């Protein structure tokens, strides 16, 4: 049966995902940046309260995946922290200036991760040569690759995802970006074994007093009074679709 991973941005969201049938959580901070390394406090609380597998993302900033020496040093420290806290896996990825996997740096990450299952995230979708990259990741011992098939969403990239799945000795290919209940059957019918979804919605803040003339964001038009949360009903719906597909 296909595995359902839910992207979560808080302990509360991780618990919601767990309670509604998620098989695994990718734990992140900063949804508007596409996911950054969670704080130590969030990592510890999730480790304490969430019982399904949780893989934190290790990503020090938004933007590209070519990092300075200082940023890479932080990545290695965060990998060691996640390992010491007892998480079963993590999510990360590093490219060089030419859009290839930065093999020397990824080798250091894999050494620091030790027995943890490492997912190479959507840095894969920004690489120059996906098939060569897939071979490099297999050589590194990467457990899985999260990808939209190098398109803006995974449904558009499904043909590339199927090509990657067919690649000899490839890691597990997990489809992500725009995967929802309404299109999930396309991925299941194509033989995708793992799917990744935010299954989320914007939730209004409980704040009654609101200073509408001030923003804490560099975007003056950003909504300070909403947050992105996992929709438990959406998770349950996706899990049900997977189970019914398996029963066919």
UniProtKB/Swiss-Prot annotation:
One GO cellular component term: cytoplasm
Main location: cytoplasm
Keyword field: Cytoplasm
Subcellular location: Cytoplasm
GO MF term set: copper ion binding
Family per record: Belongs to the CutC family.
Subunit and interaction comment: Homodimer.
NCBIfam families documented for this protein: PRK11572.1 (NF008603)
HAMAP family: CutC (MF_00795)
Protein name: PF03932 family protein CutC
Upper taxonomic lineage: Bacteria, Pseudomonadati, Pseudomonadota, Gammaproteobacteria, Enterobacterales
């Amino acid at each position: 049966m296909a595995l359902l991973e839910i992207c979560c941005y808080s302990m509360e969201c991780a618990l919601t995902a767990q309670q509604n049938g998620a098989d695994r959580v990718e734990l992140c901070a900063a949804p508007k940046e596409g996911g950054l390394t969670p704080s130590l406090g969030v990592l510890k609380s999730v480790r304490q309260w969430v019982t399904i597998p949780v893989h934190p993302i290790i990503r020090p900033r938004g933007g590209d995946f070519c990092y300075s020496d200082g940023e890479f040093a932080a990545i290695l420290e965060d990998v060691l922290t996640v390992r010491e806290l007892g998480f079963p896996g993590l999510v990360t990825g590093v490219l060089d200036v030419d859009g290839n996997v930065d093999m020397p740096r990824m080798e250091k990450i894999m050494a620091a991760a030790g027995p943890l299952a490492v997912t190479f995230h959507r840095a894969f979708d920004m690489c120059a040569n996906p098939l060569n990259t897939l071979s490099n990741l297999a050589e590194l011992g990467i457990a899985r690759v999260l990808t939209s098939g190098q398109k803006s969403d995974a449904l558009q990239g499904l043909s590339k995802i199927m090509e990657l799945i067919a690649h000899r000795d490839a890691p597990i290919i997990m489809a992500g970006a725009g995967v929802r209940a309404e299109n999930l059957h396309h991925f299941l019918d194509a033989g995708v074994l793992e799917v990744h979804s935010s299954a989320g919605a914007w939730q209004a803040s409980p704040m009654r007093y609101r200073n509408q003339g001030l923003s804490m964001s560099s975007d003056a038009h950003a909504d300070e009074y909403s947050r992105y949360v996992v929709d438990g009903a959406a998770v349950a719906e996706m899990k049900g679709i997977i189970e019914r597909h398996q029963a066919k």
